[in-house]
Amino acid sequence: NLAVIDFIDPDQFVEDMRSPDNKYMPVDRYSGSVIVRPDLLEEKGLPIPQSYDDLLADEYRGLIEMPDPTQSSTGYLFLKSLANAWGEEEALAYFDKLDENILQYTGGGSAPVKDAVAGECAIALSLTFKAVDLINEGADLDILFFKEGAPYTPAGLSIIAGHETRQPVIDVVTYFYSDVIDDYLSTYLPEKVKVDQ
């Protein structure tokens, strides 16, 4: 069983991340996004894609990498996100078509964006936080969010019932939800978790 966390203000978080019973406090959203190397696309005289449908164009054949949805939770997030937006049948048909343009499928969610930085692909369906990390290190990348939204999975913090009044537990949780989470979110995660983020 989980304890109610009554010493952290849940109103600091955006509504869709709040737990109705305050037994869960959000930490972040691990999201995926379409990440491009604008310089590589420009070299090839290609526009930056503006939609998932754009990725099906012949001109992007062999320029796209994504995590394998059967091996990577990030790849599965992309599949599930489009299944939620369009319905399962349409999403599966889309990925069958997209397969013709895929250079390679990777086993992990950050590999496509790392390959984009290395110049191995121009378009990566990959982890947003890794792209932000690489941009912070100087990589020339653009992060795109299409109208269907970004695939994501939330992460959070809970306390096991019976431990919520222990001072070390309170201290750790209070510390985490001080400036630590604000610094973490502003440095690595553009997805909104907190109201004032």
Where do the protein language model's features map onto the residues?
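An extracytoplasmic/periplasmic, membrane-proximal ligand-sensing/linker region
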Residues: 88-90, 194-197
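Periplasmic-binding protein-like
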Residues: 62-70, 94-99, 105-106, 137-161, 175-196
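Non-transmembrane alpha-helical segments in soluble domains
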Residues: 53-56, 83, 95, 113, ...
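A ligand-binding cleft/hinge motif common to bilobed small-molecule-binding domains
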Residues: 117, 122-140
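Ligand-binding "clamshell"
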Residues: 1-3, 18-22, 133-145
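A bilobed periplasmic-binding-protein/Venus flytrap-type ligand-binding module shared by bacterial periplasmic
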Residues: 35-40, 153-168, 184-187
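Extracytoplasmic ligand-binding site segments that recognize negatively charged/polar headgroups
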Residues: 1-117
